[in-house]
């Protein structure tokens, strides 16, 4: 590394006997970043990084992760503090605006979200076009994308107020659409939002109330879901967030952008892992079977995979998993299932064995956020096909914060990844008779 008069540090890259100086961009915390934006214009080369494992696509002030230390912070606040002391809409305000709200700001924000929770009545007809067996994520994906047809005034943006209104509308309407997707999938009538309830209470009300019976929200369940929403609100530049940013970089409307995020999140390697954990725990069946399945997980020739362990970023205990483990116990205790829930018993024993096993320690395979969340959802009465829908409901806040930040960033331009072409160099066309 070398430095020049302005105290900027440089990395040196040697290509074909020529040395190129690349500026090192300083992070406020965490890894610094080598600026390779001029490598192509100056060295006539691209960089190769499958999966973007070592590539920063943007500058961001929203979320910081230290995977080695197991740290997750939003705008500088530790995730555990936010989960234990805050509520979801306060965290939403923090992610979007950069600061925690004062009392007036919080009240104004929550009122705006409640005001926009209703969806256009014509959207109900869209739901009726799906067959009864449709996955709720498929319904949600289509419904969110269709919002652009109902709000053409927000297809182009010129003022900061437009960004804010769009974010609020999205945060407000996604839970309504999520609950509608569930109700339609089980053949029950839709339940309208109730502005007298707070955000989490209202979501539970729309999920479980019926026209003939009101749903009384259990405060322990409400508190648990509030924590789950906070823990899933944002997670830096993951697959779905990057998808939203890439779509947004083209100028696509925000409803379309969020629908692409939902599509990406639907992938089993991203948002569907907690459902896979439940299926795995059911397959294991009992605590006595755990050693057998641990051995299967170590066997390269066995198709069994230990779900809920390991993470693309965390090489330590996922801080979100630590919160959810205790939350899981609180929920099951409230529901009278703490001592007789077989899935929890298997999960706790599986974690204890894995954390002492050299195979998992060497590979830094620790429980992640998906390991306990599915057990909580199941205890709440939320079916597995809704797990990813709830993930998307919470992550919408992060998507909108990232989308807003992207539009306010003067460095951002339309995303255009490059490639290493390894195909045919040149071939002459032959007619079909000559082939």
UniProtKB/Swiss-Prot annotation:
It catalyses: oxaloacetate + acetyl-CoA + H2O = citrate + CoA + H(+). It is an enzyme of class 2 (transferase). The keyword Oxidoreductase does not apply. PROSITE patterns: CITRATE_SYNTHASE (PS00480). One of its GO terms (biological process) is tricarboxylic acid cycle. Its EC number is 2.3.3.16. Citrate synthase is found in nearly all cells capable of oxidative metabolism. PANTHER family: CITRATE SYNTHASE. Belongs to the citrate synthase family. This is Citrate synthase. It comes from Rickettsia bellii (strain RML369-C). The lineage of its organism: Bacteria, Pseudomonadati, Pseudomonadota, Alphaproteobacteria, Rickettsiales.
């Amino acid at each position: 590394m070398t430095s020049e008069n302005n105290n900027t540090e440089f990395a040196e890259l040697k290509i074909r006997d020529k040395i190129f100086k690349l500026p090192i961009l300083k992070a406020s915390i965490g890894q610094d970043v080598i600026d390779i934006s001029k490598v192509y214009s100056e060295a006539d080369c691209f960089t190769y990084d499958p999966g973007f494992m070592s590539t920063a696509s943007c500058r961001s002030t929203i979320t910081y992760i230290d995977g080695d230390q197991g740290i997750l912070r939003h705008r500088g606040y530790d995730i555990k503090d936010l989960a234990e002391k805050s509520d979801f809409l306060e965290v939403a305000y923090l992610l979007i605006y950069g600061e925690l709200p004062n009392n007036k700001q919080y009240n104004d924000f929550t009122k705006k979200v409640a005001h926009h929770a209703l969806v256009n009545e014509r959207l109900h007809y869209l739901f009726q076009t799906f067959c009864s067996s449709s996955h709720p994520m498929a319904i949600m994906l289509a419904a969110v994308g269709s919002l652009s047809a109902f709000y053409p005034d927000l297809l182009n943006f010129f003022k900061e107020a437009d960004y804010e209104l769009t974010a609020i509308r999205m945060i407000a309407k996604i839970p309504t659409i999520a609950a509608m997707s569930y109700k339609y999938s089980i053949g029950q009538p839709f339940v309208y939002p109730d502005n007298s309830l707070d955000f989490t209470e209202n979501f539970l009300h729309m999920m479980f109330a019926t026209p003939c019976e009101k749903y009384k929200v259990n405060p322990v369940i409400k508190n648990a879901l509030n924590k789950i929403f906070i823990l899933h609100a944002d997670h830096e530049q993951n697959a779905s967030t990057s998808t939203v940013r890439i779509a947004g970089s083209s100028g696509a409307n925000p409803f379309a952008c969020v629908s692409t995020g939902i599509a990406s999140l639907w992938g089993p390697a991203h948002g569907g892992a907690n459902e896979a954990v439940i299926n795995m725990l059911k397959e294991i069946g009992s605590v006595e079977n755990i050693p057998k399945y641990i051995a299967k997980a170590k066997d390269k020739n066995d198709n069994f995979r230990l779900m809920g362990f390991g993470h693309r970023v965390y090489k330590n205990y996922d801080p979100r998993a630590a919160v959810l483990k205790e939350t899981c116990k609180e929920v099951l205790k409230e529901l009278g299932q703490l001592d007789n829930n077989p899935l929890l018993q298997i999960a706790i024993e599986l974690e204890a064995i894995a954390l002492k096993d050299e195979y998992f320690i060497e590979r830094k395979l620790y429980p992640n956020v998906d390991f306990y969340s599915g057990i909580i959802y199941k205890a709440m009465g939320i079916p597995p096909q809704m797990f990813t829908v709830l993930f998307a409901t919470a992550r919408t806040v992060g998507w909108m914060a990232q989308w807003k930040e992207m539009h306010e960033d003067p460095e951002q331009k339309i995303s255009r990844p490059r490639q290493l072409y390894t195909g045919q160099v040149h071939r002459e066309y032959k007619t079909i008779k000559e082939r």
